[in-house]
Structure formats: C-alpha cells, structure tokens
Amino acid sequence: MESQQLSQHSHISHGSACASVTSKEVHTNQDPLDVSASKTEECEKASTKANSQQTTTPASSAVPENPHHASPQPASVPPPQNGPYPQQCMMTQNQANPSGWSFYGHPSMIPYTPYQMSPMYFPPGPQSQFPQYPSSVGTPLSTPSPESGNTFTDSSSADSDMTSTKKYVRPPPMLTSPNDFPNWVKTYIKFLQNSNLGGIIPTVNGKPVRQITDDELTFLYNTFQIFAPSQFLPTWVKDILSVDYTDIMKILSKSIEKMQSDTQEANDIVTLANLQYNGSTPADAFETKVTNIIDRLNNNGIHINNKVACQLIMRGLSGEYKFLRYTRHRHLNMTVAELFLDIHAIYEEQQGSRNSKPNYRRNLSDEKNDSRSYTNTTKPKVIARNPQKTNNSKSKTARAHNVSTSNNSPSTDNDSISKSTTEPIQLNNKHDLHLGQELTESTVNHTNHSDDELPGHLLLDSGASRTLIRSAHHIHSASSNPDINVVDAQKRNIPINAIGDLQFHFQDNTKTSIKVLHTPNIAYDLLSLNELAAVDITACFTKNVLERSDGTVLAPIVKYGDFYWVSKKYLLPSNISVPTINNVHTSESTRKYPYPFIHRMLAHANAQTIRYSLKNNTITYFNESDVDRSSAIDYQCPDCLIGKSTKHRHIKGSRLKYQNSYEPFQYLHTDIFGPVHNLPKSAPSYFISFTDETTKFRWVYPLHDRREDSILDVFTTILAFIKNQFQASVLVIQMDRGSEYTNRTLHKFLEKNGITPCYTTTADSRAHGVAERLNRTLLDDCRTQLQCSGLPNHLWFSAIEFSTIVRNSLASPKSKKSARQHAGLAGLDISTLLPFGQPVIVNDHNPNSKIHPRGIPGYALHPSRNSYGYIIYLPSLKKTVDTTNYVILQGKESRLDQFNYDALTFDEDLNRLTASYQSFIASNEIQQSDDLNIESDHDFQSDIELHPEQPRNVLSKAVSPTDSTPPSTHTEDSKRVSKTNIRAPREVDPNISESNILPSKKRSSTPQISNIESTGSGGMHKLNVPLLAPMSQSNTHESSHASKSKDFRHSDSYSENETNHTNVPISSTGGTNNKTVPQISDQETEKRIIHRSPSIDASPPENNSSHNIVPIKTPTTVSEQNTEESIIADLPLPDLPPESPTEFPDPFKELPPINSHQTNSSLGGIGDSNAYTTINSKKRSLEDNETEIKVSRDTWNTKNMRSLEPPRSKKRIHLIAAVKAVKSIKPIRTTLRYDEAITYNKDIKEKEKYIEAYHKEVNQLLKMKTWDTDEYYDRKEIDPKRVINSMFIFNKKRDGTHKARFVARGDIQHPDTYDSGMQSNTVHHYALMTSLSLALDNNYYITQLDISSAYLYADIKEELYIRPPPHLGMNDKLIRLKKSLYGLKQSGANWYETIKSYLIKQCGMEEVRGWSCVFKNSQVTICLFVDDMILFSKDLNANKKIITTLKKQYDTKIINLGESDNEIQYDILGLEIKYQRGKYMKLGMENSLTEKIPKLNVPLNPKGRKLSAPGQPGLYIDQDELEIDEDEYKEKVHEMQKLIGLASYVGYKFRFDLLYYINTLAQHILFPSRQVLDMTYELIQFMWDTRDKQLIWHKNKPTEPDNKLVAISDASYGNQPYYKSQIGNIYLLNGKVIGGKSTKASLTCTSTTEAEIHAISESVPLLNNLSYLIQELNKKPIIKGLLTDSRSTISIIKSTNEEKFRNRFFGTKAMRLRDEVSGNNLYVYYIETKKNIADVMTKPLPIKTFKLLTNKWIH
C-alpha cells in the first residue's frame, strides 16, 4: 500500500541514491576500471528490483538528538544518531518540516546504510548507478534555469528527461589525509556537477545559482560525511562543522575561495619569475609592483626569501640596470631593499644626466659597487664594534652593498620615527645633481645584521681621522686635492675625488661645518668623531645623542646593528652639479675604467688577450684608451690564482745537476707499487723499487704490506748492500709523500744514518719521474711475461725480479752503457739465463716411495739471489724451489704433456704452452749433481699459499678421500710437444696447502681451522686447533688435509689441556752442551738452581718469604726486597699456608691420569697410549702410518675390497669440507630486512616503531646530504663496479629503542672502489681497560658521549653510486654518494681520519703513538670507538670544554656526564660499569647476558643445579667420524657460531677466567659433534649461573708513588697436537686485572722450560706497549714486573752464559728476555704454582683450584 502511494506521489520521492543499490559488494582489491558487461547488467537488474521493493520506515523509528552537540540543530535536517554521523546513515525529520518533505504530514525516512554509501559498493565506471534518482521521480535532480522558480521538473516530461539525462556517475575518492583535502574538494565538486547538482555549487562571489532543496541537502550531507571521514578533515573544516555539522555549503564556498587564492598565487609566481625592467618606467612603480607580489605571497604562506627575490629581480634587469647582475651576484646577504636602492640611484642619475655620456653612470656604478678596493681585490677586513662602547674602528673601505631596514626596531626617545617617505630635492638648475629621495626618519627599524647599512644616515666612527662621504649632494665648496692620501684599515689606498665642507643644521638651530672627502669607493658614509670633537661636538652613547660640551643636545644617535648612526637630515644640501664633481679630480686615470674591473668583466682573461682584443676592436663600446692600464703590469687577480692554479713546470734536463754532483749510489730514487689484489696471503702484494741516479742500477724487494717495520727492513737491507758491495754511502733518497715514507720511524732511521730525505711536492708525480717510470716499465714487463708464459698471477713478483735482472744488463740509449757497467759489474752471462716460464724437469732426491717418479715438471722463473741455482715453480706441489737440479725441456722428445698436475684444478692442457726458447745447457751437462739441496731457506716465495678467492663449495658434493694422492698418468697417447714453450696453467688448486715444500716430508694430517676470530683484548685473534684434553690422532687422515698449519704458527691461537710429561730425552738449554739428559720437573730444577745460583743463594730463604720469589735483578734505586714486595703487594693472589722449603707443590697432582686407550681423534695430542715416547719417534710413527695409508689408497678398489675399507669413511667429508670452505658459512644475522620489519611484520606496535625509526633515518640522511639530490643517473650510463647496492636494516637495541639504518652492501664492493691500505681503527680493549684503571686510581671524572650518524660526517673521495632501496620505486635510477655511508669498506677509515683531524686541530688533542683512537692533552684523555667517546679528566670542566668544541661540528649527545659523587652506572662498549669515584669500579655484563642467553635456545639448568666451574679436567673430545647429513651439519655449525661468538665476546671483555674453555671449544666450531655441543652448553650454562659476577677493582693506595704493571705467565708443556704447548698471560695494573690471553705456542717446545720461555716472551711486547701507554696517560714512574712459576726459566734469563742454546728459536727468545731485564728495567720473580692465577689460562682445573685462583679478582 505504501509503495503504491510512493509511486503515485513520485514527484516528491527521494532519489535512488539509496534505493537503487544491489546486494553484491565489490571487493576492495578489484580493479576499479575493470567492469565487465555482465556486471553492468547485474547492476541494472538489481537496481530495478531495489526500486520496486523500496519502502518507508515508520515514524516511531525517529532517532533521538545527538548528545555531542549542545547547539540547536537546524530544523531542516535532523541531528545524527550516536555521534557526528548517523549510525545507519538515516535522515529523519521533526515536526518543523517544510512542505513537500513527507507524505500526508507524516515524517519520512530515507534508508541510507553504510555499505550502500561506501565507494566500494558502487562499481565506478560508465555503468555506475550512483547517484541516480528512481525512475518514478521523472527526472534526476536537474539544475533548473534561474528563471524557473520550481525546484523539480514537470512530471509530464519525466520520461523524456529521464532518458536524456540519465547517466552513471563515478563517486569521489575517499579522503585519506588533511593535506589532500584541496584536491579532494575539486573531485567532489566534479562529482556534484556530474550528478546534476552544479547549480547548488557556490560561485566566485560565494552564492549558488539556485536554492538547494532538502533532498539535495540530505544527499550533500551524507555523501560528504561518507567520503570525507572526520579524522582526515583539516582544522578549518572541523571548526565549521563544530558550529553546524550540516553546513556543507559553507565548506564548499570557502574551498572555492581558496582555489581562487591559489590561482592568484600561481599568477604572482609566474609574474615574479618573468620580471622585466629597463628604466622605461619609474623605479618607484617597479618597486611597488614587486613588493606587492612578494607581500601577497608571504601572506599566503609562500615565503620568498631575499636571495631568491634578488635573483629573480636581477635576472629581469636589462639596459643600464643589467650591470647590477655582475656587481651584486657575490653578496650572499643582500636584501630586496638594498637592490632597489641601487636601481633608484641609477634611475635618478639617468633622469638628472641625460645630456652627459650615456655610460657615465655605469662607470660610477662600477667604481661604487665593484672596485671598492681599487687595485687590490682582497676583501677588506670588517672590524666589529662593541654595541656598548664608542665606535673605535678605523676608516675602512666600504663593503660592496647598502643595507635596508626592516620593521622590528624600538624607537628612540629624542626623535620620532616615521615610516619611510620620499621627497625629491628641488635644485635650482637642470645641472643640479639628483641624489634620490631623502629619508626623513631619525630613528629606524633595524635587523640584527651587524654588516647592514642604515640608509639616510652617517656612521659614527671614532677610529676614522677624516670624514668620507660617497654622494656629492651634501659637499660644499668642493675643490680638487690630489695630494691627499687616505688608507683603510687594511692599509689600502682609497682614491679621493674631491675635498669640501660638510655643513650641519642641528635641532638648536646652530650650524657647524667640518671638512669632508668625497669618494665612491666606500660602503658607509663615515662621520669622524675626531673632526666633530674639533668643533666641540661629542657623542654620548649612554644617552644616544650628539651634544656640545655644555650639555646641549644637537641630534639623536641611532643604534642599528653593531654601529651607531646619525641622520643625514641634519646635513645641508649643496648645489654642486655633475660636471663639477667629475672635473674635481684632474687625473686622467680617474675617468678610465680600472683594469681589475675590465679583467673581471672579460671573464678573467689574461692581460695580453684583453689588450689584443681591444686593439683590434673585437670588443666594441670602448677602446684601449678607455682602460687604465697603469696597474695591469703588476696586477695579480686572487680569483685567477685560485681558479687557474697549476703545477709548476718541470724543466727538461733539470736532474743533470744531481748526476754531476753525486757519485754512484749516493742519490737514490724509491717508490712503492701496489697493492695487487686477489692474491694468496703468502704472495707479496707490493714491491718497493730503488734506482741509483748516476748508474741507473735498480733493485726491487717484495712487500706483503706497507707497515713501518716492513719498509724499515728494506731500507736497512739496501743500505747495507750498497755499503758492503759498492763501498759507497747513500747521501740522499728521493721519495714521495706517502705515509710509508713520512712516518717518524723511517725519518729517525734516515736521520740516524745521516741520509737526507728528499720528498716530492704533493700531487706532483712528474717530480718523481725516475721511480714512477721504472714501476711502469717493470709492470709492463710483468704483464707481458705472465701472458707469454701462462703462469698464474701469484708469481707476478718473479716476473718483476726477472725483468729487473735483464733491465740492469741492457744498455741505455743515452749513455750507451748498461747499469751494471756503470756500477763496475760484469755483463750478464746469458748462458745462465732461461726464458721466463721455461719448462724444466726438477730432480726429486727424496720421493714419497721408491716407485714414484724422480722428476717433477716445473717452470723456470729467474736466477737465485742467494745461490748459483735457479728459482723454479713446481705446479704439482704449488711452490717454488731454489735448485740447480733441473733439466731443460727441449725439442720434440718432451713428454711433459703426459703429467697430470691436478685434474681438479687445471683446465688447460699443457700442449697449449707457447713462447719459444733456446737451451743453454749442453747435452753432456744434463745430469746434475745430486748433492745440492733442492730447497733454499732464502727464497722469498718458498711457500705459496693458494688463491684465497672463489673457494670450491665442497659442502655441496662429496669429495673423495683420495683427492690429495699422487695423480696417475694419462692412459691415452698424448701429442708430442713442439719446440714452443709449454704454457703453464693459470689456476692453482685452492685446497692444497702452501706448506707442501719440496722435498715432500711425510706429515701428520690434522686438519687445521682458520679464520675463526674472537675479539680478544679488543682486537682479533685467530682460534686454532681445538681440544679440551685431546687424545691421539688417528693415523689415517690424508696428508693433503694438513692445509692450514702454517697459518696457525703465525697467529695467536688458543690451545688445550696440559699434561706433565717427564723422562723425555731432550737437549739441555742455557749454558750447557747439546746432550741428551732426562727431563726434570720444575721442582727438581728449583733445587738445582738453589744449589748452583749464587744470586738465589744470596736471596732470603723461601721459608722467610710468603711468596717464594726469586729476584733476577738488583735495582740501584730500590732494594730488591722492597721492589719485590711493591710488585706483589696489591696482586689478587690466593692466600695459601706457608710450606716447608724442601716440599715443592706439584701443580698437576690433582689432574686425573691420562687415558691409555687410543681414539679416532683427528687432532692428535696427549691421549696417546705411550705418553713417554720420544718426540722424534712419535713424529716418525705418524709419518710412517700416513705413508702406508697413501700407498694403500692409491690402489684401493671400493668394489672388490669393501670389507677392507680404510679407517676414514666418506662421512668424514663434512669436517674436511668445512675446513676447506670455511668462508662459505654465512655469518650470523641479527638484523631485520625491510620486508621483515615493516611489510610482513604482524606485530603492529613493533611495526609502528620500526616505521618511525625508518622515517627518522631518512630525515637524517637528507639532513646530512648523504647523496646528491640534484641529479639521478641511469644505471646503464654508470660503470657497474662503481655501483653499490643498498638496503635498510632494522634492529632493537639493548635499551629497547628501535633502530633503522640505511647501509651499503660493502660485502660485494669492487676492490677498485676503495683503498685497501686504509684502516678503520677503534680503541683497543687494553687501552680502554688501562684508562679505566688509571681513572679509578686518580679520581678522574668519566664522561660518555655519542655522535649521531658519525660516518655521514666524513666525505667520500671515490665516485660511487648506490641503488635506492627497492620499495622506493627507483629501480632503474642511481644516486651519487657524497658521504661515507655505513657499510662501505672505506667509511670507517674516512670517519677515523675526519674525527682524528678534528680532535687534533680543533680540540688540541694528540694521538698516543702505537695506540690508535687514544687521544690526550694535558688535562683530558679520550678513547674513541667509532661514534662512542669516553672522556677521562681530573677536572670536569675540561671535559665540558671538549664537549662544547665537538658540538660545534657534530651532533654530540651526552650519554653520561659523570658529575655525581655517588655510584654512577655506565654502559661502555658492552661493559656494564659501576663506578664510585675514589673508591671502586665493577665491570660486568649481567643485564646483557640475562637478555641474550635465553634467546640462544640452550637448555638452561637441565638438572636444576648451578655449575661451579666451566669444565673439569680429564675430559677428552672424541674425534670419531661425524655421521651427519649436510643440512644438519650446517645447522649445528650455525648454532656453534652463535654460542661461541657470545662466549668469546664476554670472555675477552672481562671474563678472563673462561678464555681457555672458550678458545678450546671455538676450535671445534666446524666439528659440531654431540660431545662438543654438550660441552658448549655446559659453558653457556656456567656463564648463565655466574652472569652476576663482576671484575672488581679497588682504588690503589694514595701513598703509592709508582704505577706497577705486572704480567703473570704460565705454560702447559706439550698438551696440544704436534706436542705444542698452551701458554697464558694475565696483565695487572696496580693490582687490577686489565686483560688476559690464552693461546697455543707457535713453536714446538721440547721441555717445560722452553714452554715457559715462550710464554714469557709472548707477554713482553704487550707489556712494553702498555708501559708506554701508561707513561703517556699518567706521568708517574712505572715499575714493570713479570712473574713465573718456572725457576729454570728465571735461571736462564738471569744467566750470563753466552754458549749456544739448543736451537736458534728459543735462544733468540731467551737472549731477548735478557736484554729486556738488563736494559728496560724489567723485574722477574718467582711465584708458586698454586698462586699463579695464569694457570686458569692453560688447562682445565678442579673446582676447588679454579675458585681459589679466581675468587679474589672476579666475584
């Protein structure tokens, strides 16, 4: 019924905006443009159905009033329900409805549901049905004509109108941001227009074309609130809605006004950008036009600063005004008002001098604005005046611009200040000079710029002796006076045009005149207070007035900026005309253009070019006579000197005087070449060359690095060689300014030897041509030799050596002699020379077996330096040898192509060898003597480590155990070799050790592990052979897998448990003959020393000393006993009861007996069945077994002899693969990528924090100008090696903050894009601990700072580009880096150099030599770790002064100022420190461990008990086969890396008691057996149980006059594989433990004494370095002590017997220790084994012993 009524009264029905909706919703991810025809039909059908079913809602459903709005609601539209918007989008009507709103007088409701009004419901497109009124209406809401008073159309034409006007309207987009509202309104208005509602939209005057109906208002209200959510509305829109929430029309009206305003703004900007002015219109009109535009833009929020405005104005100047572009472009602080002053001046002079020369004003403008300094272009010095004192600056040349006023200055008391007015000065005749408009104000508004001029005022200057003025308008009685000489404050002449009188008319009607000079070459009109004083006028700056001596006030003084001014309105104008002023100075040069000005005008061309151009009339408008060339001869343009600076010209033949002045070998040239990248570690990366000036004799020496000691060794060698071989002394060495030559060490060496260093100037390579050309020649020869021979690149220096030998023997075209002949040497015997790379066969006199071939193919390199042999490269052994036992391959009889060097590595067949050769050995000389040694210890490349790059990924495939066995020969017939050379293979096998030296010794095959690093002592130490208490090695491992042993002999490795081996025949040490004697224990040695050593007999007996110390040296200043007590007094040693002197403790009596059974341990060691076998027999046994295995594997048949398989199974490949491809293991990643942190992060709160951190990082990058934002580059145009990938990484810091960092992928950075010689230094951990210890003893304040984004302060020198992150959508573009982005290889070094330079130059610091990142001055010590700074000072103000200086340049944050006298807590480089000044310091990591250890997924406290020690003695790591698949192996290795990584970090920070256990397990990272993992879990469990332990320091006694530095040393003899010994050292400063070290001895020791000597010798260098650091930081005297529990070691160190030691290695170490004791005041004392706290560094100890040795210093 009701629906029928609706159809009958369709002319007042509500529209189909709510009725014609479908029941289907459009998915949010649907393409809004993809609307198929089928969907259109569905929409139409649904619309029809909905129209037919539309009903009204009963009146009882009216909604209550909205409680959120207190103001009354409009009668026409009801308030919404439950908030500012309707809950169901339903509009109701109260009783005050207008007619036509409802049927039969009942309230009607329009059903609007949220989904119906949603933009997603109405499919956008041409078929969209929103908004469309129902067909019963007759027509959509059409816009009636203004004449029509009806709102709706006539029903008679409903059908036709509906047909003609029906269309589908795309809804407006959703508003998503307040900033997008202006653009959204435009689309909304367009939406209303398309909906036939254009008539209700307000016009420009704010009124619509027609009145809006109620239905339209309802529609307007609902659509606005749906598509413009309240949270995204601008503030001004919310303000309107808060008054009337339905007033949408007001919002539309104001939005249209803003659009019109935006249009006006755009027009103003276009006008301002296209300004044109040539003087055809008055300057006032032009100024008014420009200022109005700028004011309008500023009022609308578009700020146009002075610089931009001036540039736009000057760009539009033309004609005479164009000249201002060149005179004003350098003034950075110029204002618009200043520029218009110049425009006005030119315009007025144009008007006043129309009959004069056209360019006359231009000349004056030139002199005024561009030639202030006359012939001297140096910028005049500005002397600032004290605003509270009298101006006392001297007369100065004016700056090049005037200054305008602004509007924020207070007025003065004596004169009212009015707004600037302009009144032209009326002159008596047409020749009167017009000087512009006079300023009438006596007080002005001013800015704070001290260099601004106050227009219309004179500057009061107490330092000026004469008054100077620029304008002739006020000069009376002008006359010429060329004899006046005036200079400015910089002693530069100021040209004077005229002299006259300056007449004043003051407030009291008195008139006064003073002398004045006229010159246009000043910036300010200067009024001399001295000349005013001569006429009884003084300036009172307290009252700010000019007054007479009787107190009569004459005129007010204005304070503007830093100066004081008096108004020109008190000056009387004159009637001087333009010609009068011009003709005052009769000098011809004053009417000419000054040459400096012409020089700048003509683009700084040289004088000759300018003169020639003027003479030939190539430049018009003036000729050569118009230029004053009086100063052109001696004129120097500073800009030209800077911009055109060039290197000095080198005169040909300039070095001839050196050749005539010096004898041979007195003048040398030297230079360093390198580095050569991608080479093995054992191959040299550099070489240093020397060339004699006179003879041109050349020497080359290989270098592995450019360190000071390496360079010094070469210099020592070359000087000794020249002195001994040529009986000459080097007088001068010429070199460049590289740091390797300019360092202090080399400088002192040259000075000591009386050699003068001659350095080249910076960046002047031509001055170093001799050395540079030699390096280029040798490098060309090297490339040619390698190309011709086909030898691998790691032999590059051999090619250099060969070329040097040949070049020294070739004659010079100039001298017709060779360098050898000039040096007096015989010519080169070419019969002894072979072509580089000549194939040869080398005799092997000691093959692996009797059936192996005796000849080894090789390639000749160059003659030996040290013998009559030849250096030959053996590819099969990957080494070079020095031998004469070789035969040259020649002719067609060569069968070298049948040798298979290494099928796994070499891809080229040996038949490809080229390079012809000629044999120089006769046929009867082929058989060489067998008694010559094949090897030579002198060869610099005797061991070749293979190429470290591109390791073979052996983890992905099985490797046969027979990979390293001798290769078999080819079974097929091979082609015979022609007479051309055989080309050697270019690649070498990266998996064969460099230690395989000919003759091939049979070695144990223990696989070594390299590059496992720990942060020990603040640095990096390599961790070596694993073992807690290792058992003997299986004798079945291949010898080829002993691939890294040499690496570990030269590193600070960590080793394993100690066992007391006795009764082993050894050679005695010290002063005895080499005889075999029984091994004795330390106690027996101690007894023997007591009976034999007189110094020990003289010392107090042991029962009278609680420490049982044996002194070594008797000091002259302090008694031995006092020194001993002083050193021992404060050490944290355990308390033990005194023992009988005849009873000596056995430090190993608590150790359990060694297991007698033998396991499959691949690492060998102390688990052997016969612990007392001699060393020689033990080694021979291993070698013999290895040989048997290798022979058996050569003939092994896996099919027929499966049951007899040798002891190594295929599963062992997991350990082998890990050793060979250790670099393939990915590092632990603790950060998140962008997609992990933001895109796919389901934790909303964390995601928001990461987003905030991301925006903060982006803003910081833009603030620091990290890259060039002016230009983006195409990827195709840039060299790929200069392109660096970039990415964002995210992590959560320890303090809970979320951090984002934009980093470069330095891990894939090309080597050519950075200097590998640069180092990124950080403070050494020992330096930090030393500084903290000294701070405690000296009551220092400790201040902690942080520099934000430190790397970004360092500029980058190289040309590098980065790819923007992928999510930024710039995949095809590149941006150029300007700053050192985090992640780049050179960023750390660049930042170090930047902050180092700033600390030295600006903060007055100096870096402590030998201790990078430690800076000091007389008051402050600074430790620098990247962006963290720790400041130590006795005076807190000294720290604050440094902080103030740092903040001037860097964003410096004070983390902890350290000013409290109570306990202060720090977090310094991972250490949690509690410090109470003058009392104690505690160092720990409890909070960090509490957070990190649970994240390691270690089963903590599995048995519910706490561990008392990290390990127990008697535990052995089994080295059985590791039966594990690939994936599980990698997973466990990754787990071990995490666990040991954390343990190493903690151990080397402060838990020195755990170092032995940490290092032992670290060596098993690549052998993650179940036993190793369990032991690692036990170590982590102990760290968890003792996480609250701290390293405790107490302040030293204030009465102590000295600093005491002590090293406690210990060694465990022979408890490592190959009978290596474990050594350990602990370092203490004033009784406080500051560091520790546990490592494996690099040499095999044959007794406990040798092991102890090795341990002590390892501690001495660091002891000396720490001593130097302490003396630099604290000037107190220092006592160095060394404690050991080996009396025999003490006896050897103390002995004066100089007989030969057992071997040169330990003899050298012992003699070094003697020198330290005798020459460096090192005191050595004995300490009981049970008190030796270094014992924890060398072996696992029982719980009781472990606690006893550690509980005094860590608890």
Curated annotation (Swiss-Prot):
- Mind telling me which residues the site (Cleavage) is annotated on? 401-402, 582-583, 1217-1218
Q: Where is the composition biased (Polar residues)?
A: 48-60, 127-152, 1005-1015, 1054-1082, 1101-1111
Checking PROSITE patterns in the record gives: ASP_PROTEASE, INTEGRASE
UniProt: Mg(2+) 2 binding residues? 1346, 1427-1428
Q: Where is this region: Disordered?
A: 1-93, 126-173, 352-421, 956-1087, 1092-1111, 1130-1171
Active site: residue positions: 461
Domain comment quoted from the record: The C-terminal RNA-binding region of CA is sufficient for all its nucleocapsid-like chaperone activities.
Protein name as annotated: Transposon Ty1-ML2 Gag-Pol polyprotein
Question: Which organism encodes this protein?
Answer: Saccharomyces cerevisiae (strain ATCC 204508 / S288c) (Baker's yeast)
